[in-house]
Amino acid sequence: MDTNNGNAGKAFKLSVATLAIMNITAVVSLRGLPAEAIYGPSSAFYYLFAAIVFLIPTAMVAAELAAMFSDKQGGVFRWVGEAFGARTGFLAIWLQWIESTIWYPTVLTFGAVSLAYIGMDGASDAALASNKVFTLITVLAIYWIATFIAMKGLSWVGKISKWGGMIGTIIPAGLLIILGIVYILSGGHNYMDMSQGFFPDLTKLDNIVLASSIFLFYAGMEMMGVHVMDVNNPSRNYPKAIIIGSLATVAIFVLGTFALGFIIPAKDINLTQSLLIGFDNYFRYFHLSWAGPVIAVALMFGVLASVLTWVAGPSKGIFTVGKAGYLPPFFQKTNSHGVQRNILLVQGGIVTLLSLLFVVMPSVQSFYQILSQLTILLYLIMYMLMFAAAIVLRYKMKDTPRPFRLGKGNGLMWFLGAVGFGGSLLAFVLSFIPPGQIQTGSNAVWYSVLIIGCVVMVVIPYIIYAMRKPSWKDPSADIAPFHWEKGTEQQK
């Protein structure tokens, strides 16, 4: 946006409240609430801890980087590449894309459960939600429908995403919290063990593995950094919007988690079904059983909108970078709508293969958890690269204008970067430990999938980078050279 275009530019400035709401809608999702409801009151500690050491540092650091390179495409590829070279920059954008690809089956599993609960018989719905074949077919059907819609272009994506976010996330979140509050005030039995207290037992590592998944709850906040220059007085108003949005996000997560804990005993919580079961229990208590299928449809629509947004997002990012010579011509093909057709098809193939893990995992729940952990691991690697790059660029590009700067000196950047990097590293290590609360099958399968998955997904972009050829570069590519490159010659 041209901010120098007189009143026209000012008309498009975002208010603090608007940006805060955008932050909330970009991050909030309900599907992960059951994983934290297991922890009872201590879940609030995990949400707050992750917000302090991850959510806020991510939003603030990404804001400086986004403003610094607002006139250049590439996102994390640009940020990391300027600090550590094109090879590592390609690794960062690759991880952002591949983790979202691996994430699809997990969020779609939740979508399949929502579809199962459209019926009126709770027992039959639960049995259907646990059926591997039903879940597999539903996951693939929803994903390929989302891909087909994405192929039609951004106009379709925008319409469905806009309404899906409101109908499938914001309204159900508010309803869940209201139901929980009214339930307790009306004398309903509280199944949450309040004696556990706010602080968890941090000496038991296997008890905090699920808590590391909270970092994935907050993932994606770096994408909001592109709006840093869309507010008046960004040095004052952007941090204010981030703080307000972060506090509201934490409040929604905490209250939503407590609402589930109030109505479902911890021992009965299921990662994939408990959100729907919680709604059903509340509706029965208030004699509103007819509303169960309605909320299931709404959540299902929200899943479709969420997947559609991500199908069209990270794949577009790696497509743009690929045209600059980092991907073979096959991956640069588009359809008549200008959509990255071949990347979407390859992405769909990966999702289909991953979904077949249903047949080797002991349950839908274990499949959901292990893929969630792999997604977290890959995304955290990207975040560690981003935090490290932000600090390094304070020295490599110290004279480059920063429209939004964290502090006058380097102290605040060091603090936020170190806190974010340290928090990401801690969550990365914890994510390898099998959770004690969930049956994930053989530990050998758990470690094999996570370790081999991480190694393979990190090595692949290095292989692609080593094999690149001059003929891969599209003359129409709009990726500016890095500051350390001479002219437009890429690093060899």
Model features per residue range: what roles?
Residues 8-18, 101, 133-140, 232-236, ...:
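Loop-to-transmembrane helix boundary motifs in multi-pass membrane proteins
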